[in-house]
Amino acid sequence: AFVVNNIAADAVVNDKLVGVLSIGPILEQPTGVERFQWNTEKNSWVSVWTRGDVSSTSMIPAVSTSSNLVFVNGYDANDGWDVKGLDWNSGATQHRVVFGKNNRGNGAYAIIQYMENGDLLFNSVSGPFRVKL
């Protein structure tokens, strides 16, 4: 299992559209992702790894079994919007695409998709576009 913290703690945003556009660039983005594994002997979830520094503001994470990565879309104060590929076993960043500080890199509750040739089909708040990798 993989979970993200995408609830802004200090900001009360009553309008979903305003929230999805402002959390990150204007309002402080929430951070934190964690991978769990089911322990069949204890019948309970066990944490495999956590990353308190990773932002996943609204886009649905995607797991790639072929690359052994989980992909998240978030906002970084220095670089702006990005997609990070985290190693499924360790949580280490293995892949990163930086979009910059405009909202074109805001996935706004969409799904991260990689094409068969490895290019990213990014479903942005401003519409889908292809990122050649």
What is each of the regions a protein language model found here?
Residues A1-V98, N102:
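Loop/turn-rich, solvent-exposed surfaces of beta-rich toroidal or solenoidal domains
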